[in-house]
Amino acid sequence: MTSNFFPYKEGTATFLIDPYVRVYPIAILMGMIISILTVAFFWRKEKFNFDHFFALLFIIIPSSIIGARLWFVFERLIYNPQNPFPGSAWYAIWEGGLSIQGGVALPAILSLVYIYFKRDYIDYRKALSMILPTVLIGQAIGRWGNFANHEVYGKIDPTGQSSLIFGEWLARHMFIYNANESAASAAFRYPLFLYESISSIIGYIIIVWIIQERNLLKPGSNGGLYFVYYGTVRLAMEPLREESYFYYSLAAMFSILIGGMMMIYFEIWANPSRYVKTKIGKFRYQYDWTKVVVDKKDKKIKFQSNNNKNKTEGKIKKYVTK
């Protein structure tokens, strides 16, 4: 049966327009665009200034690519220091080699720094909730770029049923041999990229379009939920990987820990009096950000809200402390 399948070498690229346009960068670009459009939807819903949105884009887009590549380079240097980039170079990003951990970590840190300095204009809790979970749809689409590059596959599947169940076309591209081996060693692999893509789509729908859209959790908690979800999925997939390192499992557990701490902080410890919670439908809520400002001239307390026109000063005073 396997004799009917052409063996693909690990890292062999699939072209949309041969030899100029690879599928890999197109998939990454599409994932970014849908993530950006999702954030824009919630940004407009919260009536945030789009000048800050475009400033964040200027930070996030390049830093996500740089961070993803740097993390990949770091991984290669750790696990194969003698020859980390066989037949390639550390900067050859067009040949694949992006790590989602770095693609999230670096832009998240830089975005938090920007939002901190603009905290009088952007509610950082809501920004975290609306930005971080949208990474899931970028991951889901980006995994198909990995598929096109014949990477992010699992261990050998002797029967090939894990791929054949999704059709012969997909199974053909899962008949792979490692870059440091001969074509004779080619075998069916578990379609790990597909499992991660499907799980990311499910997480995107639940976290973004059910929990976030309905404000079922307090502002900020969704950002933590992303880390918990991603870490859990990553940890569950680790046993299926061709090369499973303790480092990856440790990173996944750290992601779950950080996400859990964020959720506890925003749901329990963070000052709830900064928000006015309003039920606007069945299982649908609205959190209005409020802030106490003391006028320096007349020493009077003023109350600001991102949706002040829908709240009387009495209602705001009821929920806001000095």
Swiss-Prot record:
Its EC number is 2.5.1.145. It is found in: Cell membrane. Pathway: Protein modification; lipoprotein biosynthesis (diacylglyceryl transfer). The lineage of its organism: Bacteria, Bacillati, Mycoplasmatota, Mycoplasmoidales, Metamycoplasmataceae. GO terms for cellular component: plasma membrane. One of its GO terms (molecular function) is phosphatidylglycerol-prolipoprotein diacylglyceryl transferase activity. Belongs to the Lgt family. This is Phosphatidylglycerol--prolipoprotein diacylglyceryl transferase. GO terms for biological process: lipoprotein biosynthetic process. Signal peptide: none annotated. It comes from the Bacteria. It is a multi-pass membrane protein. It is an enzyme of class 2 (transferase). Keywords: Cell membrane, Membrane, Transferase, Transmembrane, Transmembrane helix. HAMAP family: Lgt. Catalyzes the transfer of the diacylglyceryl group from phosphatidylglycerol to the sulfhydryl group of the N-terminal cysteine of a prolipoprotein, the first step in the formation of mature lipoproteins. It comes from Mycoplasmopsis pulmonis (strain UAB CTIP) (Mycoplasma pulmonis). The chain crosses the membrane at residues 23-43, 53-73, 97-117, 191-211, 250-270. A 1,2-diacyl-sn-glycero-3-phospho-(1'-sn-glycerol) binds at R143.
